[in-house]
């Protein structure tokens, strides 16, 4: 689970030049603790704290709750904690991880977002979250959605035995076709 607006809320409060904002956002995307050091100014400790609050849900949420976040970021963190709590309550054996700085592919999202993985399967099964609806260039209400990646899903389900088939070109004699089918 992630909250793409969390870091954005912190960075927007820093009044950084565009190139510094981009460099800092890149350092966060790479989880580059050292790269954050020279760019974050007064938000360095909070941003490093967010990096430390990445991982298995319960310890990550505990670390996240200890951070002194700006108001907008607190709202995003609160939503993340609420959704994670609901997921963990509904499926206590589910492996849930938290990444409060993740936003790659979620830049347009407005709330808690998620990526689905399954152990032993290469790639994401899907991802989704909340995003603004836009009609004819005007923004409207939020929507929620999920994209499932069929290639990954097919790798995740057990394969059945392939059905035996034969190719019978037009004009194949019925006796030959019957013999092939008998094999």
Residue ranges of each PLM-predicted region?
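Short, conserved phosphate-binding/catalytic loop or strand-edge motifs used
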Residues: 2-9
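Positively charged, Gly/Ser-enriched RNA/tRNA-binding surfaces
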Residues: 6, 14, 35-183
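Long, charge-dense
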Residues: 21-39
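Long, charge-dense low-complexity segments
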Residues: 10, 14-20
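Short, flexible active-site loop motifs that bind/organize anionic cofactors or intermediates
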Residues: 11, 23-26, 143
């Amino acid at each position: 689970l992630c909250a793409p607006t969390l870091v954005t809320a912190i960075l927007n409060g820093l009044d950084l030049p565009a190139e510094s904002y981009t460099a800092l956002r890149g350092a966060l995307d790479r989880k580059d603790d050292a790269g954050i050091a020279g760019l974050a100014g007064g938000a360095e400790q909070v941003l490093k704290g967010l990096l430390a609050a990445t991982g298995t849900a319960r310890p990550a949420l505990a670390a996240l709750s200890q951070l002194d976040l700006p108001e907008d970021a607190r709202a995003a963190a609160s939503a993340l904690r609420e959704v994670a709590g609901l997921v963990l309550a509904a499926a206590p054996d589910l492996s849930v991880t938290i990444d409060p700085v993740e936003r790659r592919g979620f830049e347009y999202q407005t709330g808690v977002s998620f990526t689905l993985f399954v152990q032993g399967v290469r790639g994401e099964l899907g991802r989704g979250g909340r995003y603004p609806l836009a009609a004819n260039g005007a923004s409207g209400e939020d929507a929620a959605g999920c994209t499932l990646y069929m290639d990954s899903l097919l790798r995740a389900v057990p394969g059945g035995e392939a059905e035996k088939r034969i190719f019978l070109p037009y004009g194949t004699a019925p006796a030959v076709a019957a013999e092939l089918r008998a094999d």
